[in-house]
Amino acid sequence: MLAFSPALDLTQNGRGGLSTGSFNANYAGYGDLIPCKTAFIDAHTPGSDQKENFTIIGGGVSESPDQHVHIKDTPGFNIGAAGQPPRCRNSLHSHTTAEVFFVLKGRWRFFWGRWGKAGEVVLEEGDIINIPTGIFRGFENIGLDYGMIMAVLGGDDAGGGVTWAPQVIQDAAEHGLILGDNSKLYDSKKGQKLPEGISPMPILSDEKLAKMPEPPAIDVIPRHVARYLDLMGLAGKSPIKVIGEDAMLPDKPGFEMDFITRGSSGSAWAPR
């Protein structure tokens, strides 16, 4: 079990608990999650066109007006999820704030770098990766069945959007999708055009691309990956801080992440 902070205010109705209306507005059941299949610029690109995107807390960085946001209030971070069939991948992109993934189901390959060749790691169910901010990253379901990963993005606005690798924008245009400089998608297959005053999202210059980090796996995996079996052992009697300034994966992304087991759940809520 994962716990995030800062936590939602549970006394907002002034009587020590949530009202029914407030609770419903801040609750999203797994069976109620509504996917969006046109969330990002690669929605028509072969190999990436079967993705499902879920925005659970906050709007995340979805580029589609069709995206359903389940819980609109954000406590300093956004939580979303991606569901993908086998061999479906999410194209190379970067964020200006933290992006943390927790594997809910399946087997996933995460890769990074300008062309996705700088390094990679394979994660199993329960594993966590805190991808370094400012590098191009992508991920692919390499399991045999439909897989799902949860994502946590730092900031109430999740950093304000996505920066795509140039080849992703070019491939998308060949399949009818254009991203405006307002971070919204326009589908030429549906007869959509860029509105007046909106230009295509510019691709990064060669100068900016040259400054993008290309860390090798040896620099990323030890400080940015936490394995489920290790977490279970470390959190056997008391919760372990996975992400935070003094955590297992040291970082200050604007939120903290703890891992709690049945054996440590009692001490998780004990007064400190």
Specify the residue positions occupied by each region the protein language model found:
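A short, N-terminal "cap"/entry segment at the start of jelly-roll beta-barrel domains
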Residues: 1-75, 183-272
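Short histidine-centered beta-strand/loop micro-motifs
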Residues: 67-72, 89-95, 112, 120-122, ...
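Short, conserved beta-strand element in jelly-roll/cupin
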Residues: 76, 81-86, 94-114, 152-156, ...
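Histidine-centered metal-chelating micro-motifs
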Residues: 89-91, 109, 128-129, 133-138
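A short hydrophobic beta-strand segment most commonly corresponding to one strand
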Residues: 100-102, 130, 144-163
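Short acidic-glycine-tyrosine-enriched beta hairpin
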Residues: 114-133
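Intrinsically disordered, low-complexity, charge-dense segments enriched in Lys/Arg
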Residues: 158-168, 172-195
